[in-house]
């Protein structure tokens, strides 16, 4: 029973850790896409369009940070998501208008490409952050853990202090492992969170270009 529980714990921890790493990667990609799009706004046809696009991107990166900071599914996160979509729409309209006016401009095509990637990554981030370890697996893990600890406690119940201590340590170790699995699987709450330093650095870069 202990061996089976160990395999299940290892499998679940691996699932949780891989999802955590995927979330870290999408945050980095998000920051890179925002930074690239900002730099390419200088390729717009007029200085006025560049200033307008950069202003929208300043608001956009601030909104992205609000989405990362807010608890998943909270009213604050939903409001920030609505604002983000409006900013994406405004940015796309601005760049698309310039592209229609200058259909042969390679520079505008480059900006459209990076803007499209930035918008796509915002949706990818939502999908990856919502991709949790299946609840059925977590439920099975909890049931298996409870049964295993109960069996060990029963078998060691008539033993001495050393056997009771072993049972306590085993239960604590299993509980701690499950806690870490759950914490890794919830990136916007708990103790272990996905860092957004790369997005903050992108924001600092954008603000420095005023």
Where do the PLM segments sit?
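Membrane-embedded or membrane-proximal helical elements that form or frame transporter/channel pores
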Residues: 1-9
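Transmembrane signal-anchor/signal-peptide helices with a preference for the extracytoplasmic
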Residues: 9-28, 185
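Short, contiguous, pocket-lining structural segments
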Residues: 22-26, 79, 83, 110, ...
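Short extracytoplasmic/periplasmic juxtamembrane "stem" segments immediately C-terminal to an N-terminal membrane anchor
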Residues: 27-44, 195-209
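Structured inter-helical modules in multipass membrane proteins
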Residues: 37-130
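Alpha-helical transmembrane anchor segments
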Residues: 127-210
């Amino acid at each position: 029973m202990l061996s089976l529980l160990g395999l299940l714990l290892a499998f679940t921890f691996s699932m949780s850790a891989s999802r955590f790493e995927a979330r870290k990667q999408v945050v980095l990609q998000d920051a890179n896409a925002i930074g690239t799009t900002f730099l390419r706004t200088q390729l717009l046809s007029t200085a006025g369009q560049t200033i307008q696009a950069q202003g929208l991107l300043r608001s956009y990166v601030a909104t992205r940070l609000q989405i990362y900071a807010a608890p998943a599914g909270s009213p604050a996160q939903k409001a920030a998501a609505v604002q983000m979509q409006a900013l994406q729409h405004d940015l796309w309209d601005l760049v698309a208008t310039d592209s229609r006016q200058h259909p042969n401009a390679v520079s505008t095509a480059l900006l459209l490409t990076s803007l499209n990637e930035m918008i796509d990554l915002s949706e990818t981030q939502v999908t990856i952050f919502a991709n949790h370890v299946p609840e059925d697996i977590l439920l099975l893990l909890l049931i298996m853990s409870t049964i295993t600890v109960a069996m060990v406690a029963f078998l060691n119940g008539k033993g001495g202090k050393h056997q009771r201590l072993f049972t306590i340590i085993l239960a604590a170790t299993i509980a701690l492992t499950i806690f870490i699995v759950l914490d890794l699987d919830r990136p916007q709450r708990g103790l272990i969170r996905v860092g957004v330093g790369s997005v903050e650095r992108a924001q600092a870069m954008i603000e420095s270009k005023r």
